[in-house]
């Protein structure tokens, strides 16, 4: 029996700015699993659309975005300096570019385009074909890997999430207001939950983690107990 036979797929879904990627990345590092940031993939498509005229003044031209899909190649490369993978579009590093408020304001609209979701879900399923994967997003446990052995659904108070996002962006030198970020968080929640294709929802068998008042270490302690219970022979 190979080592991968003992490993599982872990799906981490939830609201924006809950720290899903940070937590999923920490889980993967702790377990020696592969981490796949699906949110970064949707942000990468959004960035490409912005740079190629498919989004103008915040208005998304869905047909124009669809026409761009065949021109987008998304890859991840491990960055030893960060201890994590960076995302590339057509060979260009875009890790920093996809985290701007401009991308955040449009990513929910782009994510709702059926052709975009179809392309990226297929890519994600291929990436996660082997066991030993931690994947975070909005529809991992419901659409991408509905048979994942362990599913988490992360949530936190919108004001807490907005403050976290504000601190992250201002630390990078971006000029934003807390009010702007909180509005963006609430608008993304509404868009993610109401879209026709793969809306954000908690899988019936997902375990909820509200991390409004938890540190990353506290979340990890909680997770490792859950993981031990779920993987007991």
Please identify what each model-predicted range represents.
Residues 12:
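Hydrophobic anchor at the beta1->P-loop junction of P-loop NTPases
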Residues 17:
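Walker A (P-loop) phosphate-binding loop of P-loop NTPases
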Residues 20:
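Conserved lysine of the Walker
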Residues 23:
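Hydrophobic positions on the alpha1 helix immediately C-terminal to the Walker A/P-loop
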Residues 30-98:
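N-terminal phosphate/diphosphate-binding loop that engages ATP/GTP or pyrophosphate donors
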Residues 39, 91, 120, 134, ...:
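Residue-level signal for inorganic ion chemistry
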Residues 68, 78-79, 124-130, 138-143, ...:
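Small-molecule kinase domains that catalyze NTP-dependent phosphoryl transfer to phosphate-bearing small molecules
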């Amino acid at each position: 029996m190979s080592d991968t036979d003992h490993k599982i797929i872990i799906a981490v879904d939830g609201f924006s700015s809950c720290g899903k990627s940070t937590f999923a990345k920490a889980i993967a590092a702790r377990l020696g699993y592969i981490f796949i940031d699906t949110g970064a993939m949707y942000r990468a498509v959004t960035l490409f659309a912005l740079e190629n005229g498919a989004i103008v003044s915040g208005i998304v031209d869905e047909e124009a975005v669809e026409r761009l899909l065949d021109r987008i190649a998304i890859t991840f490369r491990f960055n030893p300096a960060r201890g994590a993978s960076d995302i590339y579009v057509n060979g260009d590093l875009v890790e920093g570019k996809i985290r701007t408020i401009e991308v955040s304001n449009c990513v929910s609209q782009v994510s709702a385009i059926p052709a975009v979701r179809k392309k990226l879900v297929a890519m994600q399923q291929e990436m996660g074909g082997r066991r030993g994967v931690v994947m975070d997003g909005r529809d991992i446990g419901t659409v991408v890997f509905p048979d994942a052995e362990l599913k988490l659904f992360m949530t936190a108070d919108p004001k807490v999430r907005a403050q976290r996002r504000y601190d992250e962006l201002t630390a990078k030198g971006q000029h934003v207001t807390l009010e702007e970020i909180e509005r963006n968080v609430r608008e993304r929640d509404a868009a993610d939950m109401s879209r026709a294709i793969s809306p954000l929802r908690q899988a019936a068998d997902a375990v909820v983690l509200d991390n409004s008042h938890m540190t990353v270490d506290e979340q990890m302690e909680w997770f490792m107990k859950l993981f031990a219970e779920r993987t007991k022979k």
